[in-house]
């Protein structure tokens, strides 16, 4: 993708309750064309104890969001400098395209050649890894993306900052029709300005954006009209597909895009609950008690997308980035039948060797008595289909 500039200013069948709309004061009324809004619909009816045990989002005295668990430690400037200056970087990404093609091949996604084949009806779920935390998920007659990142750099500028060493498997113009996009948080490797502009240019107001609390204004300044902003445990749906519920669920991370906007935007994960399939997207996260809460409330999931990379050194990264063993613990807490690895093999964002995450994942799976089919790795551009009737996987 060409250069972009970010201005910065700018299971069973369920019975759902009636919807309650809460608009921000600066939101445009639906009749005026924009459907961007704060929207909340109370989640499924739960027993009282579980409802009380759910962790809600919290703000500090300065009005900024905070992580509410003892598993979190705030990131300090001295520790950032210690990491950048004192720690050795072992990422070892080769400069040779031939070697990268051998170790991390980029496949042409099936839908580039056969766009009419995209979409899964009734029982079944298909996931395609497009690099880093970007997935195309097809389930319950919907197609949606997670944290779309198609640019060359995860940075405010396409001239500097972390550069991807594996190209996107496809362009935005080669995607099939996308119904929705899920955004987990506002870091540059997960909320990419150029990708947002390109997706909005192609799909316009037909594309529904699900974003965390605090991100609505930024999305509107990008020209996106169909934006739904949610707090933890709030839910919404795509118009015409009200049997599939998108719930914004917790994670342990942080947000920042400019010098002074630390944690003014919430971060989180996504639970997508349909009549045939259930999918979970962790986004970017450290290990925390939230995943057990999510598993108890919405599990078992058919498939979870869990990060396994950007984890070294542990003294610094463990609070914000799960390592492969943490990822397996998250897999277990979520009560998910299968998981797919994300957040590795695309950008060198931490100090582990670029090929280490899958190796460490398989070692952790063996320690926990799980197999590589329980928590699997995809090549860039590769798809896997899950029949949610008999749980049998097929590669494409």
UniProtKB/Swiss-Prot annotation:
Catalyses which reaction(s): an N-acyl-1,2-diacyl-sn-glycero-3-phosphoethanolamine + H2O = an N-acylethanolamine + a 1,2-diacyl-sn-glycero-3-phosphate + H(+); N-butanoyl-1-hexadecanoyl-2-(9Z,12Z-octadecadienoyl)-sn-glycero-3-phosphoethanolamine + H2O = N-butanoyl ethanolamine + 1-hexadecanoyl-2-(9Z,12Z-octadecadienoyl)-sn-glycero-3-phosphate + H(+); N-hexanoyl-1-hexadecanoyl-2-(9Z,12Z-octadecadienoyl)-sn-glycero-3-phosphoethanolamine + H2O = N-hexanoyl ethanolamine + 1-hexadecanoyl-2-(9Z,12Z-octadecadienoyl)-sn-glycero-3-phosphate + H(+); N-octanoyl-1-hexadecanoyl-2-(9Z,12Z-octadecadienoyl)-sn-glycero-3-phosphoethanolamine + H2O = N-octanoyl ethanolamine + 1-hexadecanoyl-2-(9Z,12Z-octadecadienoyl)-sn-glycero-3-phosphate + H(+)
Tissues expressing the protein: Widely expressed. Highest expression in brain, spinal cord, kidney and testis (at protein level). Expressed in adipose tissue (at protein level).
Composition bias, Low complexity: 26-38
Family of this protein: Belongs to the NAPE-PLD family.
Function recorded in the entry: D-type phospholipase that hydrolyzes N-acyl-phosphatidylethanolamines (NAPEs) to produce bioactive N-acylethanolamines/fatty acid ethanolamides (NAEs/FAEs) and phosphatidic acid. Cleaves the terminal phosphodiester bond of diacyl- and alkenylacyl-NAPEs, primarily playing a role in the generation of long-chain saturated and monounsaturated NAEs in the brain. May control NAPE homeostasis in dopaminergic neuron membranes and regulate neuron survival, partly through RAC1 activation.
Protein name: N-acyl-phosphatidylethanolamine-hydrolyzing phospholipase D
GO biological process: host-mediated regulation of intestinal microbiota composition; N-acylethanolamine metabolic process; N-acylphosphatidylethanolamine metabolic process; phospholipid catabolic process; positive regulation of brown fat cell differentiation; positive regulation of inflammatory response; temperature homeostasis
GO function terms (MF aspect): bile acid binding; identical protein binding; N-acylphosphatidylethanolamine-specific phospholipase D activity; zinc ion binding
Species per Swiss-Prot/TrEMBL record: Mus musculus (Mouse)
Lineage, top ranks: Eukaryota, Metazoa, Chordata, Craniata, Vertebrata
Membrane topology per record: Peripheral membrane protein
Position of the signal peptide: none
Gene3D superfamilies: Ribonuclease Z/Hydroxyacylglutathione hydrolase-like (3.60.15.10)
Positions of post-translational N-acetylmethionine modification: 1
The keyword Lipid metabolism is assigned to this record: yes
Cofactor remark: Binds 2 zinc divalent cations per subunit.
InterPro entries: Metallo-B-lactamas, NAPE-PLD, RibonucZ/Hydroxyglut_hydro
Annotated Zn(2+) 1 binding sites: 185, 187, 253, 284
Gene: Napepld
Sequence positions that bind Zn(2+) 2: 189-190, 284, 343
SUPFAM superfamilies: Metallo-hydrolase/oxidoreductase
Xref: PANTHER family: N-ACYL-PHOSPHATIDYLETHANOLAMINE-HYDROLYZING PHOSPHOLIPASE D
GO cellular component terms, semicolon-separated: early endosome; early endosome membrane; Golgi apparatus; Golgi membrane; hippocampal mossy fiber to CA3 synapse; nuclear envelope; nucleoplasm; postsynaptic membrane
